[in-house]
Amino acid sequence: MADLGAESVVSVEYRGRVAVITIDNDKKLNALGQLQYYALARAMQEVAKHDEVFVTVILAKGRYFSAGADVSISRAAPVDATDSHKLWLSTFVAFNLNITHTFATHPKVLVVGLNGPVIGLSAALVSFADFIYAVPHAFLLTPFSSIGLVAEGGASRALVQRLGPAKANEALIMSKRLWAKELLDAGYLNEIFDYPKGEDAAFRERVLKEVDERLGDHLNGESLVGIKKLIRRPELETIHNANVHEVFAGLDRFVKGIPQEEFRKLASGEKRHKL
């Protein structure tokens, strides 16, 4: 199992034709800072280079799949507008472009197992998966409008495409929480595996069993990734455009100081998202 550095809560394990990426930061509900999202991107980029791998599975340990961005990390910006623009351009824009591009262009069949809620940027990125499985108590929440941001992580295209415009508008514009059953009915999830809270280890094993049974040696690996490439090809240019537009719209918000003030309120407990 590869460890991707001290800043990382991400690990990679190779199981023949399957690579398993695991997020393990339960004490923070698997919230991720910029360096940890970078580590996740690097893990996926590493897997992409392995010719023997045809399926990438992303799993998480603990109560949440991911609570999104780690709001406990300071997001204070310089007072000077030029310095502020430079800071967010070199951090927010660069890191978001990288992680979104990595998910959008990942060449392996991508499987995600939601052991619990998925929030924010993480929820947007999950939408790029080819197969998504979840527990009944999982929910998706993209509270961008609540924290003064706009859509990110390719959500304005990938999440809308997978969830459908009606539910996607509820998720993105209203910052509405969508439970697993709603996600399944909308076609966002492939299947719900009935495991209660506290059974995340058993759920992870169930997802891996599904992968072995449905995407195993009885299917030609080159065909799997070849079919995915053909399915995704018409959308890629649109996704790349959405990614660029999202990060620069987000940059404008950060330069104005709007989201970091909302993050401060959340971190201090002054504000709670209306779940």
How would you label these PLM feature ranges?
Residues 1-61, 275:
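Conserved CoA-thioester-binding segment of acyl-CoA-metabolizing enzymes
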Residues 133-138, 189-244, 257, 268-274:
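C-terminal long alpha-helix characteristic of the crotonase
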Residues 131, 170, 174-176, 182, ...:
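Well-ordered beta-strand positions
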Residues 156-166:
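Hydrophobic, secondary-structure "cap" segments at the distal end of domains
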Residues 95-147:
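Glycine-rich beta-to-alpha active-site loop
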Residues 1-4, 261-275:
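Terminal low-complexity tails and localization/encapsulation signals of metabolic enzymes
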Residues 21, 58, 70, 125-127, ...:
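Hydrophobic/aromatic residues within transmembrane alpha-helices
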Residues 52, 60-99, 118:
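Glycine- (often His-adjacent) and acidic-residue-rich active-site loop
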